[in-house]
Amino acid sequence: MTSKSSPLIFERSREGRYAYSLPKSDIKTNSVESLLDDKFIRKNKAEFPEVAELDLVRHYTELSNKNFGVDNGFYPLGSCTMKYNPKINEKVARIPGFSESHPLQDEDQVQGSLEIIYSLQEELKEITGMDEVTLQPAAGAHGEWTALMIFKAYHENNGEGHRDEVIVPDSAHGTNPASASFAGFKSVTVKSNERGEVDIDDLKRVVNENTAAIMLTNPNTLGIFEKNIMEIREIVHNAGGLLYYDGANLNAIMDKVRPGDMGFDAVHLNLHKTFTGPHGGGGPGSGPVGVVKELASYLPKPMVIKDGDKFKYDNDIKNSIGRVKPFYGNFGIYLRAYTYIRTMGATGLKEVSEAAVLNANYIKARLSEHFEIPYKQYCKHEFVLSGVRQKEFGVRTLDMAKRLLDFGVHPPTIYFPLNVEEGMMIEPTETESKETLDYFIDTLISIAEEAKNDPDKVLEAPHTTVIDRLDEATAARKPILKFENLKQEK
């Protein structure tokens, strides 16, 4: 690996340098030893970087210029919905009455904030077809876990605590079985058929008296709509199980079909994906959960309700699984999502899904002559192609993904879902122009040609990035995860 990267902030540190200073205090101070027990006092000086303000600003400005995001390039990361985040969202989120409020203020002082929460709950109920919605969960997987804990409490409360199996398709997001495990369930895999949909015969085989639920994304991770969803619902419900909707792919079906109308009992949404909360940097996210009326009494508390002309917290929820997030979740993301929903309206959200589906099918059609397409039918918002043709020349999907970096394009999701060999999952979203799509398509086609005629160029990529190709074997055996490790290496 060759690095053209900047020094770490710790490497810029020089003893005695500082960014600012405070006047000498005339207040008598006490020693740390007089205030804390020995066990709480550091034995060694903390290694904070010591840098001047200008060095600090330049360091992080330089790093920010090297970041890649939706605002500076195409980001077709499958199943992540890396759409453009309208800047009006940021303007609303920075209104002082919102940005300077505190969750411990009296309800009377934050009526505007509570109204936003309540109104967003109502909008999401309409979009999903659910009867009640909580905004508390902080991310998609958190929403999955919350819904499964609601299912668990529901089954236990109905004398069916033995139901400890959750059915998960082989094309599902990896968070689905992980969330099931965290909620105390065992995952049972159901196979996909030759069309990439849930195999109904295999579903009938795995459903039994211990089935608590099935977790589905529709359209699924292959970008294929589960056309047999009503039959799936009947099979699972007849066995006493519940249906959970993973909202990761809701961007494909807004104002077209609702999870509630498909028979789902609970749904989580990703406000940071479908509803333009900025994401990709590790947070904050938001994963609201909606449920049918039979499960409403199990929702986390508090809920925000409207009482006359006022809004307030409601802690009187009979079977609540309890609080799942301090205060009431990530309020800043609620503001952005609510702004997006209100500015788009129902017609706009419908057009979003139509454009997302059109863009994905356009890319798929143009690439079909150059790559293996395992599932030929029309896709929804995303699709999966395979790099098996290029593998014949010694070039893998990983190599092509790294080569894309040289063209200023973020690679798609690769090797996922697991049931497609050399898979590359592409989700263009609705916000990209035809010119951008054509650039991406032409670039991938040129890389496919390179794989055939000049494979070393692809195998050695990337060539223009700050960090060249990683030595993955050494990185796995000798990871440098903190500054102390780096000092030891040097």
UniProtKB/Swiss-Prot annotation:
Keywords: Oxidoreductase, Pyridoxal phosphate
N6-(pyridoxal phosphate)lysine: residues carrying this PTM: 273
UniProt enzyme class: oxidoreductase
Listed GO biological process terms: glycine decarboxylation via glycine cleavage system
Enzyme Commission numbers on file: 1.4.4.2
A Pfam family assignment: GcvP2_C
Cofactor(s) listed in the protein's UniProt record: pyridoxal 5'-phosphate
Keyword Oxidoreductase: yes
GO function terms (MF aspect): glycine binding; glycine dehydrogenase (decarboxylating) activity; pyridoxal phosphate binding
GO cellular component assignments: cytosol; glycine cleavage complex
Catalytic activity reported: N(6)-[(R)-lipoyl]-L-lysyl-[glycine-cleavage complex H protein] + glycine + H(+) = N(6)-[(R)-S(8)-aminomethyldihydrolipoyl]-L-lysyl-[glycine-cleavage complex H protein] + CO2
N-terminal signal peptide: none
Assembly mode: The glycine cleavage system is composed of four proteins: P, T, L and H. In this organism, the P 'protein' is a heterodimer of two subunits.
Similarity remark: Belongs to the GcvP family. C-terminal subunit subfamily.
Function: The glycine cleavage system catalyzes the degradation of glycine. The P protein binds the alpha-amino group of glycine through its pyridoxal phosphate cofactor; CO(2) is released and the remaining methylamine moiety is then transferred to the lipoamide cofactor of the H protein.
Protein name: Probable glycine dehydrogenase (decarboxylating) subunit 2
Organism: Staphylococcus aureus (strain JH9)
Gene name of this polypeptide: gcvPB
